[in-house]
Curated annotation (Swiss-Prot):
<keyword id="KW-0233">DNA recombination</keyword>
<keyword id="KW-0227">DNA damage</keyword>
<feature type="binding site">
    <location>
        <begin position="68"/>
        <end position="75"/>
    </location>
    <ligand>
        <name>ATP</name>
    </ligand>
</feature>
<dbReference type="GO" id="GO:0009432">
    <property type="term" value="P:SOS response"/>
</dbReference>
<dbReference type="GO" id="GO:0003697">
    <property type="term" value="F:single-stranded DNA binding"/>
</dbReference>
<dbReference type="InterPro" id="IPR023400">
    <property type="entry name" value="RecA_C_sf"/>
</dbReference>
<dbReference type="GO" id="GO:0016887">
    <property type="term" value="F:ATP hydrolysis activity"/>
</dbReference>
<dbReference type="InterPro" id="IPR003593">
    <property type="entry name" value="AAA+_ATPase"/>
</dbReference>
<dbReference type="InterPro" id="IPR020587">
    <property type="entry name" value="RecA_monomer-monomer_interface"/>
</dbReference>
<keyword id="KW-0742">SOS response</keyword>
<protein>
    <recommendedName>
        <fullName>Protein RecA</fullName>
    </recommendedName>
</protein>
<dbReference type="InterPro" id="IPR027417">
    <property type="entry name" value="P-loop_NTPase"/>
</dbReference>
<dbReference type="Pfam" id="PF00154">
    <property type="entry name" value="RecA"/>
</dbReference>
<dbReference type="GO" id="GO:0006310">
    <property type="term" value="P:DNA recombination"/>
</dbReference>
<dbReference type="GO" id="GO:0140664">
    <property type="term" value="F:ATP-dependent DNA damage sensor activity"/>
</dbReference>
<dbReference type="GO" id="GO:0006281">
    <property type="term" value="P:DNA repair"/>
</dbReference>
<keyword id="KW-0963">Cytoplasm</keyword>
Length: 343
């Protein structure tokens, strides 16, 4: 017992010395209530994706990456997170490195564009410095960087068109993330990096796809979402949206590799009513008999599109279903925008 007591005194002395040198809380025992701390989250605006992420949304104080092919819904998903943060009274910033943000589309997704901070930086270093200053302010809830591929190093912009700049962007991302990750972890800010896909040349086995900006973001990101279009959604012959699949390829705080599918409607973003309808059918809250959908003995419509339209025209019923689904999965209720039937 004497050896154990001596070892305990030694570690207590070391802990006291570390706290004097680095401040209170620099080191602690993991069992001191840490396991009961709930990770604060922001909803993605898509209940099925919130469930797939395992904690009810995207984590605050963490880095997240959304990547996929062109026009797959990357920016749409990020803007939905911004809208959800604003509904909770939070502030958001959009670093538009691509100089391509559609303000009218953002407004249709529920983003309060009047309150959205936007920056269109001239080069990559400037974009990441802006992100760091915003994180350090500890006043921003969500920062979206769109996109990593557009974070062009200053040396490349100032050089000639044909000059070789091997590894410049990867070094920029690696250096910036080393600085950013510490600031982000001490804040309540979720930083979302949107990334594009490139093809590796000469790959014989495995996927030839890779993301831009080197490997640093893959390591530092708490969550990585791979978003893809599955197929078109048609109204008669007219294509009105896309069926979209998201795979959680990395998740440090819940089981990864979960997949979800939902509708993305042109001009409206993620179809909340379609997502809740699918989850309600899966859970048994809505009965599906043949092509008919029913809830508590009341018919919602024949066919999925008619049932979706019924829910869209009856926001109270939609809210009731979402509340039940969230309660069943122990998630806090986050009401969506109430849209009129004719919108």
């Amino acid at each position: 017992m004497g050896a154990v007591d001596e070892r305990q005194r030694a570690i207590d002395t070391a802990v006291s010395q570390i706290e004097r040198m680095c401040g209170k809380g620099a080191i602690m025992r993991l069992g001191e209530g840490a396991q009961n701390v709930e990770i604060p989250v922001i909803s993605t605006g898509c209940l099925s994706l919130d469930l797939a992420l395992g904690i009810g949304g995207v984590a605050r104080g963490r880095i997240m990456e959304i990547f996929g092919p062109e026009s797959s819904g990357k920016t749409t998903l990020a803007l939905h997170v911004v809208a959800e943060a604003q509904k909770l009274g939070g502030l958001a910033a959009f670093i538009d490195a691509e100089h391509a943000l559609d303000v009218n589309y953002a407004r249709k997704l529920g983003v309060q564009v009047e309150d959205l901070l936007i920056s269109q930086p001239d080069y990559g270093e400037q974009a990441l410095e802006i992100a760091e200053i915003l994180v350090r302010s500890n006043a921003i809830d969500v920062i979206v960087v769109d996109s990593v591929a557009a974070l062009v190093p200053k040396a490349e912009i100032e050089g000639e068109m044909g000059d070789p700049h091997v590894g410049l962007q990867a070094r920029l991302m690696s250096q910036a993330l080393r600085k950013l990750v510490s600031s982000i972890s001490k804040s309540r800010t979720c930083v979302i990096f949107i990334n594009q896909i490139r093809m590796k040349i000469g790959v014989m086995y495995g996927s030839p796809e890779t993301t831009t900006g080197g490997n640093a973001l893959k390591f530092y990101a708490t969550m990585r979402l791979d978003i893809r279009r599955v197929g078109p959604i048609k109204d008669g012959q007219e294509v009105v949206g896309n069926r979209t699949r998201v795979k959680v390829v990395k998740n440090k705080i819940a089981p990864p590799f979960r997949e979800v599918e939902f509708d993305v409607v042109y001009g409206r973003g993620i179809s909340r009513e379609g997502d809740i309808l699918d989850l309600a059918v899966e859970s048994g809250a809505i009965e599906k008999s043949g092509t008919w959908y029913s809830y508590s003995g009341e018919r919602l419509g024949q066919g999925r599109e008619n049932a979706k339209n019924f829910l869209r025209e009856h926001p109270d019923l939609l809210g009731e279903l979402e509340r039940k689904l969230r309660e069943a999965h122990n998630l806090r209720f986050s009401p969506g925008p109430v849209t009129g039937a004719g919108e």
